[in-house]
Structure formats: structure tokens, C-alpha cells
């Protein structure tokens, strides 16, 4: 039974959950399976501690997703990090999770630098994932915060995902260094019209870790 598509069944399950627990379940969850990352971005809360980078076991990630679907009746999961495409546990990656739970949809916040043509094709075959690639503005702003050459790797990720037919989004953190750029039409023309982004998430800078540098 696929209650992801059956609105009436989904509503009935929500009401049943409320009767049992006194409140509705969360509509979706945000899961950070690893704090490991291949970048060292200024102000990043996820890697603010350079020495402690925990990773959940595959069994734990599988259990969380299973319970979200079967107990909370959720069909939407947000994957954060760290860098999700660095995750590996028990010989498996998040692609194994995406393919196993093919009746769910996953939004993955990623720096994009690890999205090879092979990964993009696998995302396309699964058909239930959209990557939201983190940017800071244009090449200058992105490389200043994320490291030299990062923007070019992002452009390659966009090309790989476009070629594979995977829906792409962007995520951006507003700071004192890019606020003017985010207010201009050129930014949106570039990412949406030229590169093919279909949506955007904008976040406020969290004042923790190395964020005082941004």
C-alpha cells in the first residue's frame, strides 16, 4: 500500500496516530547521517568541531527511515550533514537507502563536489531524490567560503545532474558578504535560467562554531 499517493489513507493514518499519541506525527524529519565533509567551509555548523565527526551506522539510518515511514507515515525525508555523499557504513551508502525506500522522497543538502556522472545516473534511476547544492553567490563568493575550485566542481555537478534528468535545487546561507548578490536578478538568472535549478532554500547564518568568520 502506497500512502504517499493515497491522500485519504494518509489522512486516516494521521488521525489514528493522533488518537494513540495525543498529537499528529511530524510531517517530515531532518536526518544528518554523518558529520564528515570533504570541505572546510567558513562558518559551517556541521563541521565546527574538526576532531569529532560522528557517523550513524547503516542499521541506525535504516531504522530511522523505516520508523518515519511506518510509524509517522512520513514520505518526505531531508538529508543534511556533513556531506551526505561521503556517508558509508557497513559497506553501504545513502544510495542504498534511497533505493530501498523507493516509495519515499528525499531532499539532500550537498556541496555537490562528489556528484559524479555515475552518481547522477544512479540518482536518476532511483527517481526519488533531489539534491540541493550549496552555493554562496557566484564563483568568487563560493570559492572564498568553500575553497578554491569548488564552484567549478559545482558546475560539473549541475551538468551531470542535468544530463541525467535529476531535478536540482540550490541552498544558500545569507551573510553580510553576499546579501546584495541575493537581492539581485543576476543571481537568479544564473542559477535558474542558465544552470537549471528548479527551487532554492535560503538560510540565516547560525552564530556558532566558525560562523563568526562569516
Task: Indicate residue ranges for each PLM-predicted region.
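Radical SAM/AdoMet-radical enzyme domain recognition
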Residues: 61-79, 87-204
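N-terminal [4Fe-4S]-dependent radical SAM core
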Residues: 1-30
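A C-terminal junction/extension of Radical SAM enzymes
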Residues: 199, 205-214
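A short, flexible beta-alpha/helix-coil linker loop
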Residues: 47-51, 138-141, 207-210
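Short connector loops/turns at beta-strand edges and beta->alpha or beta->beta junctions
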Residues: 20, 36, 136-138, 205-207
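Flexible, glycine- and charge-enriched loops at secondary-structure boundaries
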Residues: 50-58, 144-151, 214
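Canonical Radical SAM [4Fe-4S] cluster-binding loop centered on the CxxxCxxC motif
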Residues: 23-24, 28-59, 72
Amino acid at each position: 500500500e502506497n500512502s504517499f499517493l493515497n491522500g485519504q489513507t494518509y489522512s486516516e493514518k494521521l488521525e489514528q496516530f493522533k488518537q494513540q499519541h495525543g498529537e499528529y506525527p511530524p510531517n517530515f524529519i531532518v536526518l544528518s547521517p554523518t558529520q564528515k565533509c570533504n570541505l572546510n567551509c567558513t562558518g559551517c555548523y556541521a563541521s565546527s568541531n574538526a576532531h569529532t565527526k560522528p557517523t550513524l551506522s547503516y542499521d541506525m539510518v535504516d531504522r530511522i527511515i523505516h520508523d518515519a515511514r511506518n510509524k509517522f507515515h512520513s514520505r518526505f525525508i531531508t538529508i543534511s550533514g556533513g556531506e551526505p555523499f561521503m556517508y558509508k557504513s557497513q559497506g553501504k551508502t545513502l544510495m542504498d537507502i534511497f533505493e530501498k525506500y523507493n516509495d519515499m522522497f528525499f531532499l539532500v543538502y550537498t556541496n555537490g563536489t562528489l556528484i559524479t556522472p555515475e552518481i547522477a545516473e544512479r540518482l536518476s534511476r532511483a527517481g526519488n531524490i533531489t539534491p540541493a547544492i550549496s552555493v554562496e553567490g557566484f564563483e568568487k563568493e563560493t570559492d572564498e567560503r568553500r575553497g578554491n575550485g569548488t564552484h567549478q566542481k559545482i558546475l560539473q555537478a549541475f551538468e551531470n545532474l542535468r544530463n541525467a534528468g535529476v531535478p536540482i535545487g540550490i541552498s544558500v546561507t545569507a551573510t553580510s558578504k553576499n546579501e546584495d548578490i541575493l537581492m539581485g536578478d543576476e543571481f537568479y538568472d544564473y542559477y535558474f535560467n542558465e544552470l537549471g535549478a528548479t527551487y532554492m532554500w535560503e538560510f540565516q547564518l547560525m552564530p556558532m562554531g566558525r560562523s563568526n568568520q562569516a
